[in-house]
Amino acid sequence: MARLLKAVTVCALAGIAHAFNYDQPYRGQYHFSPQKNWMNDPNGLLYHNGTYHLFFQYNPGGIEWGNISWGHATSEDLTHWEEQPVALLARGYGSDVTEMYFSGSAVADVNNTSGFGKDGKTPLVAMYTSYYPVAQTLPSGQTVQEDQQSQSIAYSLDDGLTWTTYDAANPVIPNPPQPYQAQYQNFRDPFVFWHDESQKWVVVTSIAELHKLAIYTSDNLKDWKLVSEFGPYNAQGGVWECPGLFKLPLDGGSSTKWVITSGLNPGGPPGTVGSGTQYFVGEFDGTTFTPDADTVYPGNSTANWMDWGPDFYAAAGYNGLSIKDHVHIGWMNNWQYGANIPTYPWRSAMAIPRHLALKTINNKTTLVQQPQEAWSSISSKHPLYSRTYSTFSEGSTNASTTGETFRVDLSFSATSKASTFAIALRASANFTEQTLAGYDFAKQQIFLDRTKSGDVSFDNTFASVYHGPLVPDSTSMVRLSIFVDRSSVEVFGGQGETSLTAQIFPSNDAVHARLVSTGGATEDVRVDVHNITSTWN
């Protein structure tokens, strides 16, 4: 018998309220976070009938990981979000949980290949990992072992509000492929999409501890055939999870390439502790992903990092958008300390949605990201602060009081004599508390320094400095766009080829900023600061 998750019941269990105050300390004002409780990976990202759906790993019963369900939020512009009732509630929640709903994805089955559609209604189909904490015989008659991870599906006929699990045959991919069936406890995170050229559904899922991805195809989302494997390549310092596979335009033209993304935990970017996300560029023929030669490196630590900071993980892409409009969202936290960040009554936020494309930069096909929200509706038209300096002498100059939520556009010459140039953000009046975002000229690296960013007491690795490579542009200029919220900083460098994302937990009165040039003068400086208003109002 199928299991229907009714919105009214789930709503009561989840404690969803019609009116809520999003003004707590550290509450991001233009980053999505749940009203309360624990959140991690973004799941089931789907654009359908003018609505962006954001599902996410969620504990409806507390601020720590557990009872993992699929939370749900919707938006018409990737900016203003409305939290919805829990979509998939852990089976047995409130007593003995027998199945949790781990990460996955969702599609609109517009041709009703699954047969779930009725009365002309398009079925939305979610594919997720069923985690079984106890050995059991399932409604489908299948047996599973304790701690088994398998791939299952559910469908919705009301545009994602309520979901019916496919209990007659779940899980639809019960075990890892041979010869990896001993990995049944680490087989997870299906990303499913429609492949036009082959007219088939494709899903990529992780065999986590082996640093492998398994690729399957299907005609109907129910019956799956293994067609290839990918990996291990590049960074292998921790498990591989939360994979993605998608096509992007190259250099804004008609040429395209395919991209695989894979989360890694631990073993993230150099200088970080904990999780990160790497990517590969290549070709996909409907069954096999072949990486480009220059996207694979010798050894098992070098990688193409999607973000070089500590707080961008489990990045997932939207189904339902054209390839030129591709958008990804990442979890803005880190498994190293995620359970201990000082927020209440919620824990974790999502990073800014990012538009993805491929560009040839320094003769290499490179993933570029641009922050995508309805900026015209929340960002001030005129800057709060704007200055230009033909020469910015060694030392510092205070900027205006910037507040808690703003964007900084900063550019300067790469031929400067300085060793570093930076802006101190979310700083106290005496600058004993501050976060520094800037550039190291000799190393050609962006850096983000949160060692004095506020509360760093909850984890001994949190107070750190992070770096990401950025070669100056063809005019020998360095360009940074920096997005600051109440508890986060996201830096985008150049054309978006380098980003660094980090949480910070500053004092409420840390609203000051200043420019700092060390080791000499910085040339051709321009800085513009724009206010960003709350999306929760």
Curated annotation (Swiss-Prot):
Reactions accelerated catalytically: Hydrolysis of terminal, non-reducing (2->1)- and (2->6)-linked beta-D-fructofuranose residues in fructans
One function term, GO molecular function aspect: sucrose alpha-glucosidase activity
Leader sequence residues: 1-19
Domain of life, source organism: Eukaryota
GO biological process: polysaccharide catabolic process; sucrose catabolic process
Sites where a glycan is attached: N49, N67, N112, N300, N363, N398, N430, N531
Iron listed as a keyword: no
rRNA processing keyword on record: no
Keyword annotations of the record: Carbohydrate metabolism, Glycoprotein, Glycosidase, Hydrolase, Polysaccharide degradation, Secreted, Signal
Family per record: Belongs to the glycosyl hydrolase 32 family.
Protein name per UniProt: Extracellular exo-inulinase inuE
